[in-house]
From Swiss-Prot:
A GO biological-process term: putamen development
A GO CC term attached to the entry: nucleus
CDD domains in UniProt: FH_FOXP2 (cd20065)
Species, as recorded: Gorilla gorilla gorilla
Designated name of the protein: Forkhead box protein P2
Gene: FOXP2
Protein purpose: Transcriptional repressor that may play a role in the specification and differentiation of lung epithelium. May also play a role in developing neural, gastrointestinal and cardiovascular tissues. Can act with CTBP1 to synergistically repress transcription but CTPBP1 is not essential. Plays a role in synapse formation by regulating SRPX2 levels.
Residue ranges with Polar residues bias: 1-28, 313-322
Higher taxonomy: Eukaryota, Metazoa, Chordata, Craniata, Vertebrata
InterPro entries xrefs: FH_FOXP1_P2, Fork_head_dom, FOXP, FOXP-CC, TF_fork_head_CS_2, WH-like_DNA-bd_sf, WH_DNA-bd_sf
Leucine-zipper, as annotated region: 386-407
Stretches the record annotates as Disordered: 1-44, 283-337, 436-463, 647-666, 676-713
Amino acid composition bias (Low complexity), ranges on this chain: 290-303, 436-457
Amino acid sequence: MMQESATETISNSSMNQNGMSTLSSQLDAGSRDGRSSGDTSSEVSTVELLHLQQQQALQAARQLLLQQQTSGLKSPKSSDKQRPLQVPVSVAMMTPQVITPQQMQQILQQQVLSPQQLQALLQQQQAVMLQQQQLQEFYKKQQEQLHLQLLQQQQQQQQQQQQQQQQQQQQQQQQQQQQQQQQQQQQQQHPGKQAKEQQQQQQQQQQLAAQQLVFQQQLLQMQQLQQQQHLLSLQRQGLISIPPGQAALPVQSLPQAGLSPAEIQQLWKEVTGVHSMEDNGIKHGGLDLTTNNSSSTTSSTTSKASPPITHHSIVNGQSSVLNARRDSSSHEETGASHTLYGHGVCKWPGCESICEDFGQFLKHLNNEHALDDRSTAQCRVQMQVVQQLEIQLSKERERLQAMMTHLHMRPSEPKPSPKPLNLVSSVTMSKNMLETSPQSLPQTPTTPTAPVTPITQGPSVITPASVPNVGAIRRRHSDKYNIPMSSEIAPNYEFYKNADVRPPFTYATLIRQAIMESSDRQLTLNEIYSWFTRTFAYFRRNAATWKNAVRHNLSLHKCFVRVENVKGAVWTVDEVEYQKRRSQKITGSPTLVKNIPTSLGYGAALNASLQAALAESSLPLLSNPGLINNASSGLLQAVHEDLNGSLDHIDSNGNSSPGCSPQPHIHSIHVKEEPVIAEDEDCPMSLVTTANHSPELEDDREIEEEPLSEDLE
């Protein structure tokens, strides 16, 4: 609307709108002057006049619009003065788009404005433009000042905040200093308070130690009572015989009741293991000692005595030796009998913390293995391990009985239904029968019962009942008797390479052998895996299981050292640490076992294993000559000679008096040598595991508990 009004004002020369009287009078006067002075306008060229008039018309239109807006939009507010300054600029820039050169030509032809008027209008327009520029500069300056003021205010606020933070920090420091001063003053005022607290802590520790001693005494009493109850239950079942004048058997008379030393030691370990677990729960849960121990231990011990195996009574001198031994170690009975403590190390699964004495072990047990979720989960895992081992044990027992039955039979005699027997089993006899007939004849194959080997009175050497008491299922006889591993693998290299049979070595021994066979005595983890699969067919399956065991052994044993080099991480063997570890674990005399020649076949190795088993079983008896009489010594020597194959058929009549001859002859046992079948589903078990163990060989049983835990990982 503003543009149209401007064009109409210029073209029609009627400037009567919005109080434009001054401009209209000027235009009338100019038109009159233009008509009278036509000579002057004719002198100017048309092009220059057209250009000049166009500029003057534009400036006049701008000035008219400015005057119109300033007169109509005035307000007393100071803040509104800046608004009319910005509007003329936009209008003046838009007006040239509306006024065309044709319209300017018409204005010049009609001679509305004279050149003098146009010059005056041009000067006015320049003045107006200068004012606009000044106003714009002033507006910019004001904006800059406002911006600077805002920045200054922000900086002041930040400085104030920083000052407040510094003041708060100073106040906090002052408060801390005041608190420290107060504490120092209190300590100065009460110097004996810390000493009193230390005394109270010492008293509490002494009370705990006294309570632990009381608990241990109660446990020992309960163990004795439970062992007596177990013996009574065995007497009721007819498994042992007690003289009529003896009502209750003490703990020291266990060997006279017909139990072997290994069975006594295993029974003792089971009872103390149950008590240690229940004692841990009692100290944290406030339970009663006398409620659960008898039922749980009786059930566990009776289950172990369930196989109906008959025993001979052991020689009379052994109980006195056990009594003397227990009297000498009575001050260490509590620490030695605890299942979770041995050789100064905590035997809790996955712990292996070093404890200097039994008191420190009890503190460690109460603090680290309390009744919490972790310990409960570990107990569940141990229950699963025990279940798996019981299943494996039943399979291995059946296999052992079948092997012994096969080796015990005569190959010429047909046997329709053979029954599993012991290699050297005993016949249940009364004392009168033993005195009148010290030696019994073997039964014929036509009788319904299986043939029994005739022996003189003496301890049973190998019985199925002794198998679960030896601790580990696979006895690493090469590790036990310090036989080099390479000497045993060499003759059977092809056998292990092709047959799916578990090699009778620990993972640590196999890893060391792999590293020692390498050229630079160092291997990466993948190279160790490759050696396992290349050397043994057994490790070509179940890779996840045994690879985890290999990694576990590498990180567990200190003899394996991890070294970083150009190839990456490699493993080496610290031979000093390895030999130190073996010397700590290996007990017993290796001279009792004959070295296995490398030139022998697998059958010869089997005979050598049987020799090692008999030597180990007779070790507690041979160590003390006072424990055996002439008959038992003759029996052991005869069995050794018989298994070595040195006796074929000696003394066909079979008459020898144990009282007259120190070495009575017995009927020969035909041992059939056959290689182990490679298609067995389970791992082979070394026959050394069938040997009975005495308390002196308890450390050997602990050595072999390691491979089982590795296999189950």
